[in-house]
Amino acid sequence: MNQRLSACLLFGALLSLPLTTRGQETNSTIARRTILNGPSFQTEDPAEISRGTSPSVSARELSIPERAVKAYTKGIDRLSKNDPAGSLIHLQRAASEFPNFYEAYHAMGVAQLRLGHGEEARQAFQKSIDASGGHYAGPHFGLGALLCNQQKFTEAEPIIRKALELAPGFGPGHFILAEALFGLNRLDEAQQIAHEASIRDPKLALAHLLLANIYIRRSDYSEELVELDAYLRLKPDGPLSGQAREAQEYAKRKLAGSVVIIEAAQAKP
């Protein structure tokens, strides 16, 4: 029985952009901080972030037209409210106002990924990579996740590793790499990296689901149950929770059957 639990469709949610609500602020410099703080893939000094200081606004951010910033902010807001289709209207407007707006192209890719539009997502991520000169981690993660969705794991691996060079602290990125390695059947590497991802981000439920898949492939039902329990503690009502509970029951039956076989063998004279 194939018990693998698929997380592919959740990549779009995994790559969504967290926001800081700034509805009452109208100063253009403040508005531009949305660009710096919005995506999850920035590489600012963690010590500066931990002290709560805002990164300085670069000359590039200051060069972005106000209309582009406002459209981008609206697009990110719609994306955060689970309206990827609605976000695209604003994000496309932002990119038309500022053609090198690589953050907007990246967000478009995330929206298209969540809508299940693979080719459109790929084009948007590639535009973001090109516009940033390859120095922005977000679209590399997005493209790698898309390729994992398409089971193009060999192609995905170097792209994800490039993203991790740019943003090594992004926990979900390590999970995406582990997913690619799992797809390549490099189970030891996948297990190590998925475990590291779960430590980097203790709330990253999908890392436990991937570890469960690794143990399913190894027929290690005891460890599978440990990871499924961890996943369900974090996501008791998640989109894959029903599958996880079915896998739990299957693993328990397999373990019970193993115990019966062992006891029968021990009872033989």
Give the predicted meaning of each segment.
Residues 8-16:
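Bacterial N-terminal signal peptides
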Residues 27-38, 44-47, 52-55, 59, ...:
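Terminal, low-structured helical/coil segments at or just beyond the last alpha-helical repeat
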Residues 53-70, 132-135:
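TPR-adjacent "capping" and linker segments in tetratricopeptide-repeat scaffold/adaptor proteins
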Residues 68, 102-103, 135-138, 171-172, ...:
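Helix-start (N-cap) detector for alpha-helical repeat units in TPR-like alpha-solenoids
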Residues 80-93, 114-127, 149-162, 183-196, ...:
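Structural signature of tandem alpha-helical TPR/SEL1-like repeats
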Residues 97, 131-132, 166, 200, ...:
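Structural marker of alpha-solenoid helical repeat scaffolds
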Residues 107, 141-142, 176, 210, ...:
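Canonical tetratricopeptide repeat
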